[in-house]
Amino acid sequence: MAAEALAAEAVASRLARQEEDIRWLWAEVHRLRDEQLNAPDRCQAEGPCLTREVAQLRAENRELRHCLYRLRLCLAEELSHQARLESAARAEAGRAAAGAQPPPSQSLEEDVKKEIDPDNEVKNPPNFMKERLKFFEILKKDHQLLLAIYEKKGDSSNVITVRVADGRTVKGEAWKTTPYQVAAEISQELAETTVVAKVNGELWDLDRPLEGDATVELLTFEDEEARAVYWHSSAHVLGEALELHYGGLLCCSPPGDGSFHYDVYLEDRAVSSAELPVLESMCQAIIKEQQPFERLEVSTKVLLDLFKYNKFKCRILKEKVATPTTTVYRCGPLVELCKGPHVRHTGTIKVIKIFKNSLAYWADNPEMEMLQRVYGVSFPDEQRMAAWEELQEEARARDHRTIGKEQELFFFHDLSPGSCFFLPRGACIYNTLIDFIREQHHQRNFTEVLSPNMYSCKLWEASGHWQHYSENMFTFDIDKDTFALKPMNCPGHCLMFAHRPRSWREMPIRLADFGVLHRNEPSGALSGLTCVRRFQQDDAHIFCTVGQLEEEIKGCLQFLQSVYSTFGFSFQLNLSTRPENFLGKIELWDEAEKQLQNSLMEFGKPWKINPGEGAFYGPKIDLEIKDALGRYHQCATIQLDFQLPIRFNLTYVSKDGDDKKNPVIIHQAILGSVERMIAILSENYGGKWPFWLSPRQVMVIPVGPTCEKYALQWLEKRKRQIML
């Protein structure tokens, strides 16, 4: 222990000296910048050198701090163990002298338990929680030391101007003034109802200090972004309860639409629906404690040490975090890898309900670990919770599976999971939708084509789908070659374009295909008509020149507006940009995204950006429709693709005679999956189909036995008229 203490002292001393060097160097940088106007040539040479030296020192200091963390942690463990031994020895000596019976032993784990849960509901907190909390406290102290350096007390440049969204300005102090303090200066009521801030366009914790002059927006629960933060913080409350109750490994808690969930890995057991009330009670206790959310930015290397007990967090750090540092949040005993932001404390969450559990897979891959998923919802008042419960009751009554059974539209069977059996009335709705969308395509000069259902894997390798999508494809071997059922039509349509030379005079070429598609969805994800393995889609592809792009995308947007106004849906548009696993050059992606943005601006409807949510071959415009219950469903998509024409070497002869010109492909699906659209329509209409879609438009009722013959004759006559 003595050696470790000496080592820690040496590291701390070196760290202090280097922090002082950093302060001096920064002072020099600021001095040079002030002199820049008077002597730009001299300062230009000195400035970069000093800033590089600062960067090198900071990088070395990060390593020193990490070493110091571990040394301090070892010392704390050793001292704590020694103190427990000495305390136990003194207590034993005292009892021996007094002749008293020894009281029940109490371990450090029980002290942690008391801090976590005053009611002592948790009998055995996970062992990793104690070490994690100690580690976090060391990180926090180091962060406070670093923050003190940035505060630069007494420096007049520390004064900042904060502009609030309503136009008023407030004076503050850099690295001290928080958005919550700004809100409280306006009114305490505003401060208490604000969920999260937006600082210079970036979501920001209310208690996170401002770093300079800023424009601050104060968002309440009425704002969509604030609701997402509110539910994300609620998920952390659920995560704390899951960790305490099960001792499992927390995985992830992505923001949901109107609710939240948390995935947890339990090696030898499962979550039971009977345990949900217990989890809800634990969440309520956590909320009552008003545990503050604390944010720290920490190096990835240190976080790998902090989360060494959790293989899932380590995977995220190694595979998803590309930056040298990232953030963690603490509330109570929970320390979680998270980008944030969060509400101020758990007491901000007034009402919570844990209502469902299910199974999931890590990364949605059935080959990976099976996880337990628990769902919850929360609100700032009882009235909103009551409205939500009423909406859920209405949603259960409108469930398309219930309507399908009651109206004899369709059913599923275990002998063909994920493939729907449409009964006569359901087939009537299905075919009416297909006929409707087919006619809409014909009116817009699309040419209908038919393409094969299965292809050699060589096609999918050429398109890139084999590398990115093969786990979702049904494959089989024929004559020593691997084939797959098609999950989409675009590669087949590329073969159609390439089967003969093409000229600019033919462009744009618009192909529409209504064939059957198959996707190997995980069995746990199958859910009625909303997620199936066999489906039909109005899958269209437009091959056009770069100069035709803007007009064609405009036509696609007008197409989807026409169709969804027929159904009576309102919608919102999302531009999904380059994902991490993208194909091709960044320059092409930037050009494609710019084209889509221009088209959306000209279309004139509200839209927003979904960063990183594009397809691997190109950016896309997704449409989300709003149903009668206020829920959003993603349906139509317009995707721009510069990659497939290059991968398939698709060319046409341009107007100036260049026969090596690559076309651009626009992927268009207006309804998307017909099966999924039937599910959405049945729930939106509550089973009360509009006349043109209804499978029972007319019913002939004879008033008596003498009229039956005439009624049958009339019915046959109408059938013949419909067929003609």
Curated annotation (Swiss-Prot):
<keyword id="KW-0007">Acetylation</keyword>
<dbReference type="Pfam" id="PF00587">
    <property type="entry name" value="tRNA-synt_2b"/>
</dbReference>
<feature type="domain" description="TGS">
    <location>
        <begin position="155"/>
        <end position="220"/>
    </location>
</feature>
<dbReference type="InterPro" id="IPR018163">
    <property type="entry name" value="Thr/Ala-tRNA-synth_IIc_edit"/>
</dbReference>
<dbReference type="InterPro" id="IPR012675">
    <property type="entry name" value="Beta-grasp_dom_sf"/>
</dbReference>
<dbReference type="InterPro" id="IPR045864">
    <property type="entry name" value="aa-tRNA-synth_II/BPL/LPL"/>
</dbReference>
<keyword id="KW-0030">Aminoacyl-tRNA synthetase</keyword>
<feature type="region of interest" description="Disordered">
    <location>
        <begin position="90"/>
        <end position="112"/>
    </location>
</feature>
<dbReference type="Pfam" id="PF07973">
    <property type="entry name" value="tRNA_SAD"/>
</dbReference>
<keyword id="KW-0436">Ligase</keyword>
<dbReference type="GO" id="GO:0005739">
    <property type="term" value="C:mitochondrion"/>
</dbReference>
<dbReference type="GO" id="GO:0005634">
    <property type="term" value="C:nucleus"/>
</dbReference>
<feature type="coiled-coil region">
    <location>
        <begin position="44"/>
        <end position="72"/>
    </location>
</feature>
<keyword id="KW-0175">Coiled coil</keyword>
<comment type="similarity">
    <text>Belongs to the class-II aminoacyl-tRNA synthetase family.</text>
</comment>
<keyword id="KW-0547">Nucleotide-binding</keyword>
<dbReference type="InterPro" id="IPR012676">
    <property type="entry name" value="TGS-like"/>
</dbReference>
<keyword id="KW-0963">Cytoplasm</keyword>
<dbReference type="GO" id="GO:0004829">
    <property type="term" value="F:threonine-tRNA ligase activity"/>
</dbReference>
<dbReference type="InterPro" id="IPR006195">
    <property type="entry name" value="aa-tRNA-synth_II"/>
</dbReference>
<feature type="modified residue" description="N-acetylalanine">
    <location>
        <position position="2"/>
    </location>
</feature>
<dbReference type="Pfam" id="PF02824">
    <property type="entry name" value="TGS"/>
</dbReference>
<dbReference type="InterPro" id="IPR002314">
    <property type="entry name" value="aa-tRNA-synt_IIb"/>
</dbReference>
<dbReference type="InterPro" id="IPR033728">
    <property type="entry name" value="ThrRS_core"/>
</dbReference>
<feature type="modified residue" description="Phosphoserine">
    <location>
        <position position="451"/>
    </location>
</feature>
<dbReference type="GO" id="GO:0006435">
    <property type="term" value="P:threonyl-tRNA aminoacylation"/>
</dbReference>
<dbReference type="GO" id="GO:0005524">
    <property type="term" value="F:ATP binding"/>
</dbReference>
<keyword id="KW-0539">Nucleus</keyword>
<keyword id="KW-0648">Protein biosynthesis</keyword>
<dbReference type="GO" id="GO:0005737">
    <property type="term" value="C:cytoplasm"/>
</dbReference>
<keyword id="KW-0067">ATP-binding</keyword>
<dbReference type="InterPro" id="IPR036621">
    <property type="entry name" value="Anticodon-bd_dom_sf"/>
</dbReference>
<protein>
    <recommendedName>
        <fullName>Threonine--tRNA ligase 2, cytoplasmic</fullName>
        <ecNumber>6.1.1.3</ecNumber>
    </recommendedName>
</protein>
<comment type="function">
    <text>Catalyzes the attachment of threonine to tRNA(Thr) in a two-step reaction: threonine is first activated by ATP to form Thr-AMP and then transferred to the acceptor end of tRNA(Thr). Also edits incorrectly charged tRNA(Thr) via its editing domain, at the post-transfer stage.</text>
</comment>
<dbReference type="InterPro" id="IPR004095">
    <property type="entry name" value="TGS"/>
</dbReference>
<dbReference type="InterPro" id="IPR002320">
    <property type="entry name" value="Thr-tRNA-ligase_IIa"/>
</dbReference>
<dbReference type="InterPro" id="IPR012947">
    <property type="entry name" value="tRNA_SAD"/>
</dbReference>
<keyword id="KW-0597">Phosphoprotein</keyword>
<comment type="subunit">
    <text>May be a component of the multisynthetase complex (MSC), a large multi-subunit complex which contains at least eight different aminoacyl-tRNA synthetases plus three auxillary subunits AIMP1, AIMP2 and EEF1E1. Interacts with the MSC components EPRS1, AIMP1, AIMP2 and KARS1.</text>
</comment>
